[in-house]
Regions:
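Repeated scaffold domains used in trafficking and secretory/extracellular systems
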Residues: 130-137, 172-186, 218-230, 258-270, ...
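Residue-level detector of high-confidence beta-strand sites
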Residues: 70, 144-147, 255, 274, ...
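Hydrophobic beta-strand positions that form the internal "hydrophobic ladder"
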Residues: 143-145, 192, 235, 272, ...
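Surface-exposed loop/turn elements that mediate protein-protein interactions on large endomembrane-trafficking
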Residues: 127, 152-174, 197-222, 238-256, ...
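Blade-level signature of beta-propeller repeat domains, shared across WD40, Kelch, NHL, RCC1
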Residues: 348-376
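Short loop/turn segments that connect beta-strands within the blades of beta-propeller domains
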Residues: 55-57, 140, 149-150, 188, ...
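Short loop/turn and low-complexity linker motifs enriched in small/turn-promoting residues
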Residues: 1-157, 183, 193
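Ankyrin-repeat and related helical/solenoid repeat scaffolds used for protein-protein interactions
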Residues: 311-356
Length: 376
Protein backbone atom coordinates (compact mmCIF):
# COMPACT_ATOMS: atom_id res chain seq x y z
CA UNK A 1 0.00 0.00 0.00
CA UNK A 2 1.42 3.34 -1.03
CA UNK A 3 1.97 6.18 1.35
CA UNK A 4 -0.76 8.16 -0.43
CA UNK A 5 -3.28 5.33 0.08
CA UNK A 6 -2.41 5.03 3.75
CA UNK A 7 -2.84 8.79 4.15
CA UNK A 8 -6.29 8.69 2.50
CA UNK A 9 -7.46 5.75 4.68
CA UNK A 10 -6.13 7.42 7.82
CA UNK A 11 -7.90 10.66 6.89
CA UNK A 12 -11.21 8.83 6.33
CA UNK A 13 -11.05 7.05 9.70
CA UNK A 14 -9.99 10.24 11.43
CA UNK A 15 -12.97 12.04 9.92
CA UNK A 16 -15.34 9.23 10.97
CA UNK A 17 -13.91 9.32 14.51
CA UNK A 18 -14.29 13.09 14.74
CA UNK A 19 -17.89 12.86 13.56
CA UNK A 20 -18.89 9.60 15.27
CA UNK A 21 -17.22 10.10 18.66
CA UNK A 22 -19.23 13.15 19.75
CA UNK A 23 -22.36 11.66 18.16
CA UNK A 24 -21.99 8.52 20.29
CA UNK A 25 -21.47 10.62 23.39
CA UNK A 26 -24.51 12.77 22.60
CA UNK A 27 -26.59 9.65 21.93
CA UNK A 28 -25.57 8.12 25.25
CA UNK A 29 -26.65 11.35 26.96
CA UNK A 30 -30.11 11.14 25.42
CA UNK A 31 -29.71 13.52 22.48
CA UNK A 32 -31.55 12.67 19.28
CA UNK A 33 -32.03 14.17 15.83
CA UNK A 34 -35.60 15.48 15.61
CA UNK A 35 -36.69 15.38 11.97
CA UNK A 36 -40.27 16.47 12.74
CA UNK A 37 -39.43 19.90 14.09
CA UNK A 38 -41.80 22.81 13.82
CA UNK A 39 -40.80 26.47 13.65
CA UNK A 40 -38.85 27.45 16.76
CA UNK A 41 -38.00 23.87 17.79
CA UNK A 42 -34.47 22.45 18.02
CA UNK A 43 -33.14 19.99 15.43
CA UNK A 44 -31.07 18.17 18.05
CA UNK A 45 -32.88 17.66 21.33
CA UNK A 46 -32.68 15.56 24.46
CA UNK A 47 -35.25 12.83 25.01
CA UNK A 48 -37.68 12.26 27.85
CA UNK A 49 -39.47 9.31 29.36
CA UNK A 50 -42.67 7.96 30.89
CA UNK A 51 -42.91 6.39 34.35
CA UNK A 52 -45.91 4.11 34.88
CA UNK A 53 -47.08 2.65 38.20
CA UNK A 54 -50.23 0.56 38.04
CA UNK A 55 -52.28 -1.99 39.93
CA UNK A 56 -52.45 -4.88 39.31
CA UNK A 57 -48.75 -5.53 38.67
CA UNK A 58 -47.22 -6.80 35.44
CA UNK A 59 -49.41 -4.83 33.07
CA UNK A 60 -48.43 -4.18 29.46
CA UNK A 61 -47.57 -0.63 28.40
CA UNK A 62 -48.36 0.34 24.81
CA UNK A 63 -47.13 3.65 23.43
CA UNK A 64 -48.61 4.79 20.12
CA UNK A 65 -49.89 1.25 19.62
CA UNK A 66 -46.57 -0.54 20.20
CA UNK A 67 -45.81 -2.75 23.20
CA UNK A 68 -42.87 -1.02 24.90
CA UNK A 69 -42.61 -2.42 28.42
CA UNK A 70 -44.21 -4.43 31.21
CA UNK A 71 -44.41 -3.28 34.83
CA UNK A 72 -42.38 -5.30 37.32
CA UNK A 73 -43.67 -7.91 39.75
CA UNK A 74 -42.44 -6.23 42.95
CA UNK A 75 -43.57 -2.61 42.59
CA UNK A 76 -45.87 -2.62 39.57
CA UNK A 77 -43.83 0.13 37.89
CA UNK A 78 -41.77 0.70 34.76
CA UNK A 79 -39.73 3.51 33.21
CA UNK A 80 -39.87 3.79 29.41
CA UNK A 81 -37.17 6.09 28.02
CA UNK A 82 -35.76 7.76 24.90
CA UNK A 83 -38.80 9.57 23.49
CA UNK A 84 -38.54 12.78 21.53
CA UNK A 85 -40.59 15.64 22.98
CA UNK A 86 -44.22 15.42 21.91
CA UNK A 87 -47.60 13.89 22.70
CA UNK A 88 -47.99 10.13 22.87
CA UNK A 89 -50.94 7.78 23.26
CA UNK A 90 -50.30 5.59 26.31
CA UNK A 91 -52.34 2.45 26.96
CA UNK A 92 -52.07 0.08 29.92
CA UNK A 93 -53.56 -3.41 29.49
CA UNK A 94 -53.93 -6.68 31.36
CA UNK A 95 -56.10 -9.68 30.53
CA UNK A 96 -59.36 -9.68 32.51
CA UNK A 97 -59.23 -5.94 33.23
CA UNK A 98 -60.56 -2.83 31.52
CA UNK A 99 -57.78 -0.83 29.80
CA UNK A 100 -56.47 2.58 30.85
CA UNK A 101 -55.68 5.03 28.05
CA UNK A 102 -54.52 8.63 27.91
CA UNK A 103 -52.60 11.03 25.66
CA UNK A 104 -49.61 12.35 27.61
CA UNK A 105 -46.99 14.94 26.75
CA UNK A 106 -43.30 14.11 27.08
CA UNK A 107 -40.91 17.03 27.51
CA UNK A 108 -37.17 17.31 26.93
CA UNK A 109 -35.06 15.95 29.84
CA UNK A 110 -38.20 15.20 31.87
CA UNK A 111 -40.07 12.08 32.94
CA UNK A 112 -43.86 12.22 32.63
CA UNK A 113 -45.50 10.28 35.45
CA UNK A 114 -48.71 8.29 35.72
CA UNK A 115 -48.37 6.70 39.15
CA UNK A 116 -51.96 6.13 40.26
CA UNK A 117 -53.36 3.84 37.58
CA UNK A 118 -55.99 1.35 38.73
CA UNK A 119 -57.32 -1.26 36.33
CA UNK A 120 -60.80 -2.49 37.21
CA UNK A 121 -62.24 -5.91 36.32
CA UNK A 122 -64.16 -6.38 33.09
CA UNK A 123 -67.07 -7.79 35.13
CA UNK A 124 -68.21 -6.62 38.58
CA UNK A 125 -69.76 -9.24 40.88
CA UNK A 126 -72.31 -8.50 43.64
CA UNK A 127 -73.96 -10.69 46.25
CA UNK A 128 -77.26 -10.12 48.05
CA UNK A 129 -76.55 -9.29 51.70
CA UNK A 130 -80.02 -8.77 53.14
CA UNK A 131 -83.57 -7.90 52.04
CA UNK A 132 -86.48 -5.67 53.07
CA UNK A 133 -84.26 -2.70 53.94
CA UNK A 134 -86.06 0.65 54.10
CA UNK A 135 -83.04 2.89 54.67
CA UNK A 136 -79.32 2.65 55.27
CA UNK A 137 -76.52 4.69 56.87
CA UNK A 138 -72.77 4.22 57.00
CA UNK A 139 -70.76 5.14 60.07
CA UNK A 140 -67.34 6.86 60.12
CA UNK A 141 -65.98 3.52 61.41
CA UNK A 142 -67.02 1.87 58.12
CA UNK A 143 -69.93 -0.11 59.58
CA UNK A 144 -73.52 -0.23 58.33
CA UNK A 145 -76.72 0.74 60.10
CA UNK A 146 -79.97 -0.18 58.38
CA UNK A 147 -83.66 0.18 59.09
CA UNK A 148 -86.10 -2.66 58.56
CA UNK A 149 -89.86 -2.40 58.92
CA UNK A 150 -92.09 -5.00 60.55
CA UNK A 151 -95.88 -4.94 60.60
CA UNK A 152 -95.85 -2.99 63.85
CA UNK A 153 -92.65 -0.89 63.97
CA UNK A 154 -89.25 -0.20 62.44
CA UNK A 155 -86.05 -1.81 63.75
CA UNK A 156 -82.56 -0.30 63.58
CA UNK A 157 -79.71 -2.82 63.24
CA UNK A 158 -75.92 -2.71 62.97
CA UNK A 159 -74.05 -4.82 60.41
CA UNK A 160 -70.40 -5.33 61.36
CA UNK A 161 -67.89 -8.11 60.66
CA UNK A 162 -70.61 -10.04 58.78
CA UNK A 163 -72.86 -10.06 61.86
CA UNK A 164 -76.22 -8.31 62.31
CA UNK A 165 -77.01 -6.81 65.75
CA UNK A 166 -80.27 -5.11 66.71
CA UNK A 167 -79.71 -1.60 68.13
CA UNK A 168 -83.17 -0.29 68.93
CA UNK A 169 -86.83 -0.32 67.95
CA UNK A 170 -89.31 2.43 67.21
CA UNK A 171 -90.99 1.84 70.59
CA UNK A 172 -87.65 2.57 72.33
CA UNK A 173 -87.86 6.11 70.98
CA UNK A 174 -91.55 6.76 71.61
CA UNK A 175 -94.23 4.27 72.53
CA UNK A 176 -96.86 5.91 70.31
CA UNK A 177 -94.66 5.88 67.21
CA UNK A 178 -91.79 7.94 65.79
CA UNK A 179 -90.77 8.47 62.17
CA UNK A 180 -87.00 8.08 61.72
CA UNK A 181 -85.85 10.65 59.15
CA UNK A 182 -82.05 10.60 59.52
CA UNK A 183 -79.04 9.49 61.56
CA UNK A 184 -76.30 12.03 62.26
CA UNK A 185 -72.85 10.82 63.26
CA UNK A 186 -70.59 12.54 65.75
CA UNK A 187 -67.15 13.62 64.52
CA UNK A 188 -65.58 13.06 67.94
CA UNK A 189 -67.27 9.98 69.44
CA UNK A 190 -69.23 6.82 68.64
CA UNK A 191 -72.51 8.52 69.56
CA UNK A 192 -75.40 8.61 67.09
CA UNK A 193 -78.05 11.29 66.84
CA UNK A 194 -81.48 10.18 65.67
CA UNK A 195 -83.49 12.76 63.77
CA UNK A 196 -87.15 11.85 64.26
CA UNK A 197 -90.60 13.24 63.60
CA UNK A 198 -93.07 12.79 66.47
CA UNK A 199 -96.55 14.28 66.21
CA UNK A 200 -95.31 16.39 63.25
CA UNK A 201 -92.47 17.88 65.33
CA UNK A 202 -88.74 17.28 64.79
CA UNK A 203 -87.05 15.76 67.82
CA UNK A 204 -83.44 14.63 68.23
CA UNK A 205 -82.14 11.80 70.43
CA UNK A 206 -78.55 10.92 71.26
CA UNK A 207 -77.35 7.40 72.07
CA UNK A 208 -74.19 5.30 72.10
CA UNK A 209 -74.70 2.01 70.19
CA UNK A 210 -71.93 0.39 72.25
CA UNK A 211 -73.62 1.20 75.55
CA UNK A 212 -75.53 -1.51 77.43
CA UNK A 213 -78.31 -1.15 78.40
CA UNK A 214 -79.53 1.25 75.73
CA UNK A 215 -79.95 4.83 76.91
CA UNK A 216 -81.60 7.54 74.78
CA UNK A 217 -81.12 11.22 75.63
CA UNK A 218 -83.27 13.87 73.95
CA UNK A 219 -81.39 16.91 72.64
CA UNK A 220 -83.53 19.98 73.20
CA UNK A 221 -81.41 22.58 71.37
CA UNK A 222 -79.74 20.64 68.60
CA UNK A 223 -78.81 22.51 65.39
CA UNK A 224 -77.54 20.36 62.53
CA UNK A 225 -77.47 23.20 60.01
CA UNK A 226 -73.85 24.09 60.85
CA UNK A 227 -71.27 21.30 60.71
CA UNK A 228 -67.52 22.03 60.97
CA UNK A 229 -64.48 19.85 60.23
CA UNK A 230 -60.75 20.67 60.27
CA UNK A 231 -58.15 19.19 57.91
CA UNK A 232 -54.53 20.27 57.24
CA UNK A 233 -55.04 23.61 59.03
CA UNK A 234 -58.17 24.32 56.95
CA UNK A 235 -61.58 24.50 58.62
CA UNK A 236 -64.63 23.59 56.54
CA UNK A 237 -68.14 24.58 57.47
CA UNK A 238 -71.31 23.28 55.86
CA UNK A 239 -74.08 25.71 56.67
CA UNK A 240 -77.25 24.38 55.14
CA UNK A 241 -76.19 23.65 51.54
CA UNK A 242 -73.31 26.19 51.48
CA UNK A 243 -69.74 24.92 51.86
CA UNK A 244 -67.29 27.45 53.31
CA UNK A 245 -63.57 27.26 54.07
CA UNK A 246 -61.39 29.07 56.58
CA UNK A 247 -57.81 29.13 55.30
CA UNK A 248 -54.76 28.92 57.59
CA UNK A 249 -53.97 32.25 59.30
CA UNK A 250 -57.41 33.63 58.41
CA UNK A 251 -60.29 34.47 60.73
CA UNK A 252 -62.90 34.57 57.96
CA UNK A 253 -64.82 31.85 56.16
CA UNK A 254 -64.94 32.01 52.35
CA UNK A 255 -67.77 30.33 50.46
CA UNK A 256 -66.59 27.60 48.09
CA UNK A 257 -69.89 26.49 46.61
CA UNK A 258 -73.66 26.49 47.03
CA UNK A 259 -76.11 23.58 46.78
CA UNK A 260 -73.49 21.16 48.17
CA UNK A 261 -74.93 17.77 49.06
CA UNK A 262 -71.90 16.36 50.89
CA UNK A 263 -68.13 16.67 51.19
CA UNK A 264 -65.45 14.07 51.95
CA UNK A 265 -61.73 14.18 52.77
CA UNK A 266 -59.36 11.96 50.76
CA UNK A 267 -57.50 9.19 52.63
CA UNK A 268 -54.19 11.05 52.13
CA UNK A 269 -55.78 14.22 53.64
CA UNK A 270 -54.59 16.31 50.68
CA UNK A 271 -57.90 16.79 48.86
CA UNK A 272 -61.52 17.52 49.70
CA UNK A 273 -64.27 16.14 47.46
CA UNK A 274 -67.64 17.89 47.32
CA UNK A 275 -70.58 17.48 45.00
CA UNK A 276 -73.79 19.15 43.95
CA UNK A 277 -76.69 17.80 41.92
CA UNK A 278 -74.73 17.93 38.64
CA UNK A 279 -71.06 18.58 39.53
CA UNK A 280 -68.21 16.80 41.32
CA UNK A 281 -65.43 19.12 42.47
CA UNK A 282 -62.18 18.98 44.45
CA UNK A 283 -60.59 21.50 46.83
CA UNK A 284 -56.83 20.97 47.22
CA UNK A 285 -55.42 21.08 50.76
CA UNK A 286 -51.85 20.64 49.52
CA UNK A 287 -49.82 21.01 46.32
CA UNK A 288 -50.29 18.08 43.94
CA UNK A 289 -48.47 17.07 40.76
CA UNK A 290 -51.37 15.16 39.17
CA UNK A 291 -53.62 17.05 38.82
CA UNK A 292 -51.16 19.97 38.75
CA UNK A 293 -52.81 22.11 41.43
CA UNK A 294 -51.63 24.42 44.19
CA UNK A 295 -52.79 24.38 47.79
CA UNK A 296 -56.11 26.23 48.06
CA UNK A 297 -57.13 25.74 44.40
CA UNK A 298 -60.46 24.28 43.27
CA UNK A 299 -61.21 22.04 40.29
CA UNK A 300 -64.49 20.91 38.75
CA UNK A 301 -63.85 17.27 37.91
CA UNK A 302 -67.15 16.30 36.27
CA UNK A 303 -70.30 17.99 35.01
CA UNK A 304 -73.22 15.66 34.36
CA UNK A 305 -76.77 16.04 33.11
CA UNK A 306 -77.72 13.15 35.43
CA UNK A 307 -78.53 13.72 39.09
CA UNK A 308 -75.51 12.83 41.27
CA UNK A 309 -76.71 11.10 44.44
CA UNK A 310 -73.47 10.21 46.24
CA UNK A 311 -69.66 10.13 45.95
CA UNK A 312 -66.79 8.45 47.77
CA UNK A 313 -63.01 8.39 47.46
CA UNK A 314 -61.33 5.20 46.29
CA UNK A 315 -57.80 5.52 47.67
CA UNK A 316 -56.90 9.16 47.01
CA UNK A 317 -56.93 9.40 43.22
CA UNK A 318 -60.23 7.79 42.16
CA UNK A 319 -63.88 8.49 42.92
CA UNK A 320 -66.89 6.20 42.89
CA UNK A 321 -70.23 7.94 42.39
CA UNK A 322 -73.88 7.14 41.83
CA UNK A 323 -76.61 8.74 39.75
CA UNK A 324 -80.32 7.92 39.57
CA UNK A 325 -79.65 4.76 37.56
CA UNK A 326 -75.88 4.13 37.45
CA UNK A 327 -72.77 3.57 39.54
CA UNK A 328 -69.47 4.67 38.01
CA UNK A 329 -65.78 5.03 38.91
CA UNK A 330 -63.55 7.80 37.58
CA UNK A 331 -59.98 8.97 38.08
CA UNK A 332 -58.98 12.53 39.04
CA UNK A 333 -56.08 12.73 36.53
CA UNK A 334 -57.48 15.43 34.27
CA UNK A 335 -54.75 15.28 31.65
CA UNK A 336 -56.64 14.41 28.46
CA UNK A 337 -59.96 12.58 29.02
CA UNK A 338 -60.91 10.97 32.33
CA UNK A 339 -60.86 7.18 32.42
CA UNK A 340 -64.38 6.37 33.66
CA UNK A 341 -65.74 2.88 34.31
CA UNK A 342 -69.38 1.75 34.36
CA UNK A 343 -69.83 -0.49 37.42
CA UNK A 344 -73.53 -1.36 37.20
CA UNK A 345 -76.79 0.04 35.86
CA UNK A 346 -79.32 -0.13 38.69
CA UNK A 347 -82.43 1.77 39.78
CA UNK A 348 -81.97 4.49 42.44
CA UNK A 349 -78.88 3.05 44.14
CA UNK A 350 -77.69 4.23 47.55
CA UNK A 351 -73.97 3.50 47.71
CA UNK A 352 -71.22 3.17 50.28
CA UNK A 353 -67.55 2.47 49.60
CA UNK A 354 -65.84 0.56 52.41
CA UNK A 355 -62.20 1.61 52.21
CA UNK A 356 -61.06 -1.04 54.70
CA UNK A 357 -62.69 -3.94 52.84
CA UNK A 358 -62.23 -2.38 49.38
CA UNK A 359 -65.83 -3.37 48.66
CA UNK A 360 -68.88 -1.50 47.40
CA UNK A 361 -72.28 -1.73 49.10
CA UNK A 362 -75.44 -0.55 47.39
CA UNK A 363 -79.11 -0.49 48.31
CA UNK A 364 -81.69 -0.71 45.54
CA UNK A 365 -85.40 -1.52 45.78
CA UNK A 366 -85.04 -2.55 49.46
CA UNK A 367 -82.25 -5.04 48.75
CA UNK A 368 -78.70 -4.56 50.05
CA UNK A 369 -75.84 -5.89 47.91
CA UNK A 370 -72.10 -6.20 48.48
CA UNK A 371 -69.41 -6.48 45.82
CA UNK A 372 -66.37 -8.68 45.66
CA UNK A 373 -63.12 -6.85 46.37
CA UNK A 374 -62.91 -4.24 43.61
CA UNK A 375 -59.25 -3.25 43.85
CA UNK A 376 -56.46 -5.40 42.42
Amino acid sequence: MTKKSRTIIFSIFSFLFIIGGPSAILYSQGYRLNLNTEEGEKLITQTGGIFIKAAPRQVEIYIDGKLREKTDFLFGSALVENFLPGKYNVEVNKTGYLPWEKTLEIKEKEVTEAKSILLFPEEFSFNLLTEEIEDIWFTPEQTIIFKKATTSEWILSLYKSEEETELLRESDVYSKGAKLTNIIFSATSSDLILETEIAKNKRYFNFDPEETPLSLTELKNFNQEIIEYAYNNYTFKKEGESLCVQSPNSDLFEKIADSVKEFRISPDHKKLLYFTKHEISIFFLDDTIVPNKKKGEKMVLLRLSDNITNCYWIKSNHIIFSTDDNIKITEIDNRDILNTVDVIEIKNPEIFWNENEEKLYYLSENNLFISDTLLP
